[in-house]
Amino acid sequence: MISKIRNFLTRKVGSKVLTKWVSEEYLLNNREEREKNRISENRGHEVYYFHQLKDPYSYLACQTLSELLDIYNINLKILVVGEPNIIHEPDMFYEYCFDDASSIASNYGLNTLPSKLPSSSAIKLGERILLNEENLGHDLLIRITEKVWSNEIKELEELSKHTQEVENHLEENNLKRKTLGHYQGGVFHYEGENYWGVDRLSYLEDRLEALSLKKNDNTINKGPKMIRRPSPFEHEEELILEFFPSLNSPYTYISFERVKQIESDYPVRVITKPVLPMLMRNMEIPSYKGKYILTDTAREARRLGIKIGPILSPLGKPAERAYSLFPWVNSHGKGLDYMYELMKSSFADGVDIGEKKYLKNLIKSLDLNWKE
């Protein structure tokens, strides 16, 4: 009994924290406070950019630095960082990042990636060159990044001849990135907020423009691209879209409406294959990573007009109970709708989806028979 009460209280306290993180009021109050502190400390508008030489998203992001400086009255501080401390399935991770970055580059008007990831030797030489620069500029960063990704070992060796060991510098930069609340490369940071990759750059631009930092009427405008279906759209064979939702994933939650829209707009059959949340598979997720994911999801939700908060995490027994009904619900053709309703309840209504009464009502709302 005591254990149940403790778990209940822990979830309630956690719910308040998660709900606060996704609140627009919390975001705006933080911005106001940060701006007051910046002015009182007589600091300029400093944007950090964290660059990882092995990272495909960094390869794209660094191509925007020149424009960023041309358009906005900011001080840009470039820090070269290493890989995240924890990468689950690193080979699969980098393969996905490479394929994804390659596929989106042209949509953002950026140079596409070379044919493969750079070698570890090229990366180490590139890090050594860049980390020996006291005030690293974007021109050198881009030049060395190109040489690293082209695996120009001889040229990199020549450029690194008179440089010193840089391991301590790399660790210092990694720590700075962690202190500012992130874990990846290709990340921009301005006064308490992180913007990972070119598809989040528009949020940084909006913030800088709101502070009247534009020097001209130009814009990078590398925001998310919303691709609309051609009309009419026909396909001779049925298309299959496999969807792997996780009940504790904020990104899963905001993807549902678009997945359902794809199913509606195209001759597509969605096959729903739920996966267990990472934390229920004993995977380690640092708190700062969890916070970034939630706050990033919240701004995407606001852009898309999707309600988010209050939040009550379904981790543990609630998720187990909800998942246990999925095979039966899915056998009746309601799997996608079932998962969607569960996630709306967790991420938009703060409801405990493990309660028997809740699950019974949900099953009935899907026109299914609870007694089966």
PLM ranges: what are they?
Residues 1-34, 39:
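N-terminal leader/targeting and pre-domain segments
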Residues 5, 16-19, 59-69, 141-232, ...:
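C-terminal cap of thioredoxin/glutaredoxin-like
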Residues 27-32, 223-225, 273, 288-290:
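Short acidic/polar alpha-helix capping motifs at helix-coil junctions
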Residues 38-41, 67-68:
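Short secondary-structure boundary/capping segments within folded domains
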Residues 41-57, 75-76, 235-250:
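Short active-site neighborhood of thiol/selenol oxidoreductases, capturing the structured segment around
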Residues 53, 59-148, 254-346:
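Structural alpha/beta surface segment adjacent to cysteine/selenocysteine redox centers
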Residues 56, 83-84, 193-195, 201-202, ...:
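Short, solvent-exposed loop/turn segments at secondary-structure junctions
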